[in-house]
C-alpha cells in the first residue's frame, strides 16, 4: 500500500528517478532550502579547496525525499571532482567495496545511500579506508591466506541515511561533517515548484505553486510529483496555466488534503478515534487495523503525523492530538 501513495517520499520508480535528474541543481547557489546546511558546507568546501585537501567525510541524515542524493552531487560539483554512487544494500561483499575504492582518483567523492544497511564486514573495512586511506584484505584460504595492504588516494565518503540511529558508533564517529536535513518550508517548496515548472515548460502562478507546496508534506520529491499530476489535470481541462483553482481540484481528486494527508493518513487517525477514543494505541494494534507491517507504520506513515502534531507518542502508545481531531472536524474529548 505504501508504495502506491502519491504522497510517499520514497522513490522506487525508474521514470521518476530519471525526471528527478533533470530537475537537480548543479551548485549550492541553485539548491533551494536547507540554508543552514548549505552555509556550513560552503565554508567546509571552500576551506578544503584552499588547503588543496579532500573534504572531510560527510553524513547526511533525515527523512526520505529531502535531497540528500542531490546535495551529494552538488558537493562533488563544487569540489570539481568525480562522484561514484552506490547504496548500502548493493555492496554485499568486501570485494564490492574494494572495487569501488579502486576506481577513485585523489579527491573524488564516494556516495553511499542507505549507508545504515551496509553489511557488518563491509562496514568494518570502511574504518581504515575513511581514517587512514588504506584497506587490508585477506587473500587466499587456509594456510595460504595472507593479508594484502591496499593504499588508497584521499577521498570523501558521503553517506546518506533516513535512520541515523541504526549507524554503529564507530562508523558514525568517522564522519567529520554531520548534517541533518529538515523538512522544507512552504516558501522553499513554492520556489522548488516554480523552478520545476520552468524546467517542464509549464506556466504556473504563485497561488498555484503555493497550493501544491502546502500539500507536499515538506518534501521536494512529493512537490514535484504533485506538480506533474496537477499538470495532467490542467492539460485535460485545456488550461494553459496552473492556478490555485486547478491545483486544488487536481489534488482534491487525488485525495491529498490541505495538510498533505492522504486517505491512509486520515484512516489511521479516524480508526484511533472511532475504536480507541484517540488512544493511547500500540503500534501493533495500529498496524493490524490498517493491514500494514509495524515497520511500515513507524517509518512511512507515522513520521509526518508526528511532525505536524497530529499524533504524539507516549509510554503507553500513540495518541491523536487536539490538532488531529480538529483536522478531521471532530471535537476533542475531555479526558
Curated annotation (Swiss-Prot):
Gene3D superfamilies: 1.10.8.60, P-loop containing nucleotide triphosphate hydrolases, Winged helix-like DNA-binding domain superfamily/Winged helix DNA-binding domain. Residues 258-335 are annotated as: Head domain (RuvB-H). ATP binds at residues 23-24, 65, 68-70, 131-133, 174, 184, 221. It comes from the Bacteria. InterPro entries: AAA+_ATPase, AAA_lid_4, DNA_helicase_Holl-junc_RuvB, P-loop_NTPase, RuvB-like_N, RuvB_C, WH-like_DNA-bd_sf, WH_DNA-bd_sf. GO terms for molecular function: ATP binding; ATP hydrolysis activity; four-way junction DNA binding; four-way junction helicase activity. Mg(2+) binds at residue 69. Its EC number is 3.6.4.-. Residues 185-255 are annotated as: Small ATPAse domain (RuvB-S). DNA binds at residues 313, 318. It is found in: Cytoplasm. The RuvA-RuvB-RuvC complex processes Holliday junction (HJ) DNA during genetic recombination and DNA repair, while the RuvA-RuvB complex plays an important role in the rescue of blocked DNA replication forks via replication fork reversal (RFR). RuvA specifically binds to HJ cruciform DNA, conferring on it an open structure. The RuvB hexamer acts as an ATP-dependent pump, pulling dsDNA into and through the RuvAB complex. RuvB forms 2 homohexamers on either side of HJ DNA bound by 1 or 2 RuvA tetramers; 4 subunits per hexamer contact DNA at a time. Belongs to the RuvB family. Homohexamer. Forms an RuvA(8)-RuvB(12)-Holliday junction (HJ) complex. HJ DNA is sandwiched between 2 RuvA tetramers; dsDNA enters through RuvA and exits via RuvB. An RuvB hexamer assembles on each DNA strand where it exits the tetramer. Each RuvB hexamer is contacted by two RuvA subunits (via domain III) on 2 adjacent RuvB subunits; this complex drives branch migration. In the full resolvosome a probable DNA-RuvA(4)-RuvB(12)-RuvC(2) complex forms which resolves the HJ. Has 3 domains, the large (RuvB-L) and small ATPase (RuvB-S) domains and the C-terminal head (RuvB-H) domain. The head domain binds DNA, while the ATPase domains jointly bind ATP, ADP or are empty depending on the state of the subunit in the translocation cycle. During a single DNA translocation step the structure of each domain remains the same, but their relative positions change. This is Holliday junction branch migration complex subunit RuvB. It comes from Latilactobacillus sakei subsp. sakei (strain 23K) (Lactobacillus sakei subsp. sakei). The lineage of its organism: Bacteria, Bacillati, Bacillota, Bacilli, Lactobacillales.
Amino acid at each position: 500500500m505504501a508504495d502506491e501513495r502519491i504522497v510517499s517520499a520514497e522513490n522506487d520508480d525508474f521514470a521518476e528517478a530519471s525526471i528527478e535528474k533533470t530537475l537537480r541543481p548543479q551548485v549550492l547557489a541553485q539548491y533551494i532550502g536547507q540554508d543552514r546546511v548549505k552555509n556550513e558546507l560552503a565554508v567546509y568546501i571552500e576551506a578544503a579547496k584552499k588547503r588543496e585537501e579532500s573534504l572531510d567525510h560527510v553524513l547526511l541524515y533525515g527523512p526520505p525525499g529531502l535531497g540528500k542524493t542531490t546535495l551529494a552531487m552538488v558537493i562533488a560539483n563544487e569540489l570539481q571532482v568525480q562522484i561514484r554512487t552506490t547504496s548500502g544494500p548493493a555492496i554485499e561483499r568486501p570485494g564490492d567495496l574494494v572495487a569501488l575504492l579502486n576506481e577513485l582518483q585523489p579527491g573524488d567523492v564516494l556516495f553511499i545511500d542507505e549507508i545504515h544497511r551496509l553489511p557488518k564486514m563491509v562496514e568494518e573495512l570502511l574504518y581504515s579506508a575513511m581514517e587512514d586511506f588504506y584497506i587490508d584484505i585477506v587473500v587466499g584460504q587456509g594456510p595460504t591466506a595472507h593479508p594484502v595492504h591496499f593504499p588508497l588516494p584521499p577521498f570523501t565518503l558521503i553517506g546518506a541515511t533516513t535512520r541515523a540511529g541504526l549507524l554503529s558508533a564507530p562508523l558514525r564517529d568517522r564522519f567529520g561533517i554531520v548534517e541533518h536535513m529538515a523538512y522544507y518550508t512552504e516558501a522553499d517548496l513554492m520556489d522548488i515548484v516554480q523552478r520545476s515548472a520552468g524546467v517542464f515548460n509549464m506556466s504556473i502562478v504563485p497561488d498555484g505553486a503555493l497550493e501544491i507546496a502546502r500539500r507536499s508534506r515538506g518534501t521536494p520529491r512529493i512537490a514535484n510529483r504533485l506538480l506533474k499530476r496537477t499538470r495532467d489535470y490542467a492539460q485535460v481541462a485545456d488550461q494553459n496555466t496552473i492556478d490555485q483553482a486547478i491545483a486544488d481540484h487536481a489534488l482534491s481528486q487525488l485525495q491529498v488534503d490541505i495538510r498533505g494527508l492522504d486517505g491512509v493518513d486520515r484512516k489511521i487517525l479516524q480508526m484511533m478515534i472511532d475504536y480507541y477514543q484517540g488512544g493511547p494505541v500500540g503500534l501493533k494494534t495500529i498496524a493490524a487495523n490498517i493491514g500494514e507491517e509495524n515497520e511500515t507504520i513507524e517509518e512511512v506513515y507515522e513520521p509526518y503525523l508526528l511532525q505536524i502534531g497530529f499524533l504524539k507518542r507516549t509510554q503507553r502508545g500513540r495518541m491523536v492530538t487536539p490538532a488531529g481531531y480538529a483536522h478531521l472536524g471532530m471535537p476533542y474529548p475531555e479526558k
